[in-house]
Structures are given as structure tokens and as C-alpha cells.
Regions:
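Intrinsically disordered, low-complexity regulatory regions in eukaryotic proteins
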Residues: 1-28, 33-46, 70-195
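Short edge beta-strand/strand-turn motifs with a hydrophobic/aromatic core
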Residues: 63-71
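Short proline/glycine- and polar residue-rich coil/turn motifs
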Residues: 52-61
Length: 195
């Protein structure tokens, strides 16, 4: 989870080098696939240099994409996101080993989207995903803040967390509300009938 005050963020794409690590830096090319991309350069992300460097002595390196959050909606209910389709291209000293190149899709958004582990680690026991529920878990234990992995699951302390979350969020003394002022419960969001 990233603080609202941070307006520029960096997405990192890990690249793997096959074979032995090179003793010299290697140049590879990255291009934005325009017909598959909805994100706009200079609005949603900073320009990406075509030539990128794979550092010497490494089998992995990282392509960094600078994301601009100011022009993206932060409302979870709207789920506004932009697609950035990237393609690696070979260069004189960096062969991809795949004739048609390698593509990677990066989805850019400015809201808390469901972490990878939400369903898998807990087999649905955390109920539907809502950012307010995730914020509570993070407040209790920073281990929950990682989007990609969580050390807890239904077989360890995770069971205590989801049982406590259910009791906590359903208790009127701990009421939490979504961005439209609707009460968030463990298993639903209360929306007035007139809406």
C-alpha cells in the first residue's frame, strides 16, 4: 500500500538472463506497443528510454517504469486502470532467444486492488475484497502490506486474523465506511435501498 501523498511511484519488472552472467553490460530495447496500450506517456507514466542496460555480472535485472498517479482516479469503486503493453526487442549484444520478442502487460491504477494472496492464502475466508478490510489487516500487522505475498494463511496465525477481522469490522464501535459513506461489513457493503 502506498501513501496518498506519494504522487510518483516506480513499477519494477524483473528480467532474467539465460546462460552465464555477462562480464559486460548488455543493451536491450524496450518499446511501448501502442495498439495495446491505453496508458498515456507523460500523463500516466514517464517516457521510457528505448535502450535499457542489463548490468554486468547479473542473471536478473530490473526494468523501472515511473508511474504518475496525479491523473489517475483513486476511487476503488470506479476501478479505473490503464494498460501499458511493453515489448522487449533484441539488440546487437542482447538476443531474446524468441523470434517474435517478449511482451509484458503492466496495469496502472491508483487504488488499492486485491492483493495476490487474498483468496489463495485464506481460501475465501477473508470474504470479498475491500480496501477498508485490507487497511485494518495492515494496521494490525505490516506483513499484510505486501501486494504479492503474505506469510499468513489459514493454517497459521491467519486463522486468528480473519476471525478477529470478522468480529472487529461487524462491531458498530469499529464501523468503517467506503468512499461513498456506505458501511463495510465483513461479508457485504450496506447500500441504502434508494441507491
Amino acid at each position: 500500500m502506498i501513501a496518498d501523498s506519494i504522487r510518483i511511484d516506480t513499477a519494477r519488472i524483473v528480467l532474467h538472463y539465460s546462460g552465464n552472467a555477462s562480464e559486460q553490460e548488455r543493451i536491450y530495447h524496450v518499446k511501448v506497443v501502442q495498439d495495446s496500450t491505453t496508458a498515456e506517456e507523460g500523463i500516466h507514466y514517464q517516457p521510457i528510454q528505448k535502450e535499457q542496460v542489463f548490468r554486468p555480472g547479473r542473471l536478473t535485472d530490473t526494468l523501472k517504469i515511473v508511474v504518475l498517479r496525479d491523473n489517475m482516479n483513486s476511487r476503488f469503486l470506479d476501478k479505473e486502470r490503464y494498460r501499458l503493453e511493453l515489448e522487449l526487442e533484441p539488440s546487437e549484444d542482447f538476443d531474446l532467444g524468441i523470434r517474435q520478442g517478449i511482451r509484458k502487460t503492466l496495469w496502472l491504477n491508483n487504488y488499492m486492488s486485491e492483493p495476490v494472496w487474498w483468496e489463495g492464502n485464506f481460501h475465501g475466508r477473508l470474504g470479498f475484497f475491500h480496501p477498508e478490510k485490507w487497511k485494518i489487516l495492515i494496521n494490525w500487522d505490516k506483513e499484510f502490506a505486501n501486494q504479492d505475498k503474505c506469510k499468513y494463511d489459514q493454517n497459521n496465525r491467519g486463522q486468528d486474523y480473519y476471525n478477529t477481522l470478522r468480529s472487529y469490522i461487524n462491531n458498530d464501535a469499529n464501523a468503517v465506511y467506503d468512499e461513498d459513506g456506505h458501511r463495510v461489513y465483513f461479508d457485504h457493503v450496506e447500500v441504502p435501498e434508494e441507491e
